[in-house]
Each structure stands twice: as structure tokens, then as C-alpha cells.
Amino acid sequence: MAAVLSPITRQVSKEPRELQRVCVDIRLEDVQDCLVYDRRGGSVPFKNLYQHTKSVIIFVRNFLCYACKEYVEDLSKIPEDVFEGKVLGIRLIVIGQSMHHHIEAFCTLTGYPYEIYVDPDRHIYQKLGMKREETFTDSAQPSPHVKSGIFAGQMKSIWRAMTGPIFDFQGDLHQQGGAIIVGPGAQVHFCHFDTNRLDHMPINWLLQLAGVQQTLDFSKPKIMHV
């Protein structure tokens, strides 16, 4: 009997002209039973996030990281009707690595209205193989979603840590994040692991890889409905 292969996805480079694909082995079975926690501290198995639908799952470095904050601010600009189309049925999920009591403040700060969980022990980060150091290259493209420079951004992060109601750094400062598109079931469609704080996958690319045809303009401010 032939061996059953682990689900394999594609890591997509962010070259502007051509998408070059390299196979990456993603073992969902290693993380499917890991617990993630919602803003109330309730736990759910990781597999519940993608078992019945296709999910775009974004792992951020930590909630104090200025680059992650600005990236999630742009995620908050995605109109709800992009995901509400029943033909697509896509879930957008952010996962951080802080304690659950930081979720509410982060959502208030960024205006992020969609699903968010935390993996405080970084079990999923580690088992999926996300990096725990930063690598910068001369050829790296700047993130279209991060507006602050490194020095100013770091000062903002330190200030938020010092003035927050609970002084801590809300996760491992060296841990990098990534993005995966998975589901329904064990299907793995795409994977990108960040090499540094500015290496987020452009949101429009993620949406298109998930099947969304609409292209969004993230240079515009978020529209608030009252």
C-alpha cells in the first residue's frame, strides 16, 4: 500500500512580475489538536478554524509589533461582504502569541472586526516551522502595509508597552509570523513564513490566492458605518 503523503502547499515569492513556487511541507496533523484561545480565554482546537471552510490564517509576531499593528489595521479595511458571499465562504483569522487578555485592546487599537485567537505557548508557530529570527536582504520588497520606519515604529511599540494597563511585551519578540490558506478539511492551498517584521504577504495577493476576485485599495482610510 502506498504511503500517505503529508499535505503540501506552495510558498509563493513576492516577485512583482512572476510568482515562483517552491514546495513546502506543511504537516497539519502536527498542529490540528493544538489549542488556541479567544478573547474570553475559551479554547478551541486549531483544526476547528478550517475544518468546514477555507480559511486565511495570519500569524502575527506579537501584538506590540508596530509592523503587525499596521498590517492588521489594513486587514480591518477589508469589507465584510468580501467574505460573506456564500459561494466563497472564506474565514479570515488572525493568531497572535500573547495571552488572551491582550486581544480586546489590540482589536480596539486596530479596528480589526474578524476572528482572532492566540497561541500563547507558540506550539503552532514552532510545529509549523516559523522562524525565530529576522533575516533582511537587499532585494526584499518593502511591505505595502507598513507605513512607519523601523526606528519610529520601535519607539511606538515601546511606548505602548510602557503605557499599557499590563506591562509586558505580549509574546516572544524574536518570533516571526506567516500566513496559510487551508481547508476545508486537511487541504493546504498556500503557505508563507515571514523572514522579518516587514515580510508580510500582501493582503490582495492572499485574497486572490483564496479565490477573492476583488482588488482592494488599502491606501484609503477605513470607512466607518454608523
From Swiss-Prot:
Any single Pfam family the record assigns to this protein: AhpC-TSA_2
Matches recorded under InterPro entries: PXL2A/B/C, Thioredoxin-like_sf
Top-level taxon in the UniProt lineage: Eukaryota
Entry-linked PANTHER family: PEROXIREDOXIN-LIKE 2C, PTHR28630
Recorded family membership: Belongs to the peroxiredoxin-like PRXL2 family. PRXL2C subfamily.
Protein name as annotated: Peroxiredoxin-like 2C
